Amino acid sequence: MPQIKINGVEHTIDADPQMPLLWAIRDIVGLTGTKFGCGVGACGACTVHMDGQAVRSCLTTLADAQGHVIVTIEGLSADGSHPVQLAWQANNVPQCGYCQAGQIMQAAALIKQTPKPSDQQIVDAMSGNICRCGTYQRIRQAIKSAAEWVG
């Protein structure tokens, strides 16, 4: 049985090691902030951090995740005080909100790796995260705001 550390807690997952991490996070561990969007890694709704890197949990198997540190939107900040979350609020990014967890996780990984991202780096990093409401301009502004606050 795969053992995976999610948000600082060790979990023994009684499931097929080929199960997508997304379903273990949502259905077994009970953390529903990570969303299912497409199931093929194209939309970004299921983005989590694995050892600090943004990954698509719908494509990452339990076997792939074993031995790695997984952080979901719930683990990014217990009280919503991560700079990206605060910037999201300050820039009025959310509309329907479905993509927000994945967008925030992708943006947080970007800022951790590239504390002062250029406009093109933001566009490139966020290109795999789809927002059906079209708030891309506000998303980019929020990332710039968060980067300023962090740096």
Short names for language-model regions:
Residues 1-151:
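Signature of N-terminal electron-transfer/Fe-S-associated modules in redox systems
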